[in-house]
Every structure is written in C-alpha cells, then in structure tokens.
C-alpha cells in the first residue's frame, strides 16, 4: 500500500510540477539599440506569456519613457535611444503594477476593464485588485 501510494504521489508530482514552474517564470526582455531607435524584438512573446495586450504594454512603455513607439508584429520600436537598463527598469515596473498578484505573488493573472477601471484578476488565488489607469 505504501509503495503504491508513493508511486502515485511521484507520478502526480511529475505531471504537476512542470506547469507550476512555468507560471512563475518571468520572461527576459531583449533590448537592441540602433541609431535613434530602441528595438525590443521579443515584445509580442512577452505580452503573450504575461497574458497582456501588446498595445496596452506598448502604451505603458511610451508613457513611462516619454517617447513615441510603434508595434509591428511582435517587435516594438521606440523612436529614441534608451539605455537597456532603463527599459528593463520600466519592464519591472510594468510587471509589479500590472502582472504580479499583490495577494499571492503569482504572475498567472489577467487584466479586465470593468467600466472605467482596470481590474487584475488572479487565476491562482481568485483575488481581484484594481490597478491604476494608464
């Protein structure tokens, strides 16, 4: 009986653990500097992984960095040279404000607009938290 239980428990851990690990991984941002431009080639993949609208993320970056930008497919281009450290700091701020659940610290959240307010709903613990508007 104990061996059977341990075998089933081990099987359950092998099935569940990979999914739990994926939820906690925050993708790294890639920043490329060109003359008078800053390009983020993996912007679309990041938006998809974080379960956020790519244009919502782009609007946040444009407001925080005070430069215009364009989204072409999965690539986001800022029209102005910005240091990779500055762009990474803005990315971390976006994650803190609009991705991480303040109750359980999970990144498995979704952003909804309820009336005129954005609400972050955690899919892990079920908490709903209003977030500041853009």
From Swiss-Prot:
Q: Name one Pfam family in it.
A: eIF-5_eIF-2B
Checking InterPro entries in the record gives:
IF2/IF5, TIF2_bsu_arc, Transl_init_fac_IF2/IF5_dom, Transl_init_fac_IF2/IF5_N, Transl_init_fac_IF2/IF5_Zn-bd
Q: Which UniProt keywords apply?
A: Initiation factor, Protein biosynthesis
Q: Does the keyword Protein biosynthesis apply?
A: yes
The reply to whether Protease figures as a keyword in the UniProt entry is no
What is the top-level taxon of the source organism? Archaea
What is the protein's known function? eIF-2 functions in the early steps of protein synthesis by forming a ternary complex with GTP and initiator tRNA.
Q: Which HAMAP family match?
A: eIF_2_beta
What protein family does this chain belong to?
Belongs to the eIF-2-beta/eIF-5 family.
How does this polypeptide assemble, per the annotation?
Heterotrimer composed of an alpha, a beta and a gamma chain.
* Name recorded for this polypeptide: Translation initiation factor 2 subunit beta
Organism of derivation: Pyrobaculum arsenaticum (strain DSM 13514 / JCM 11321 / PZ6)
List the lineage, top down. Archaea, Thermoproteota, Thermoprotei, Thermoproteales, Thermoproteaceae
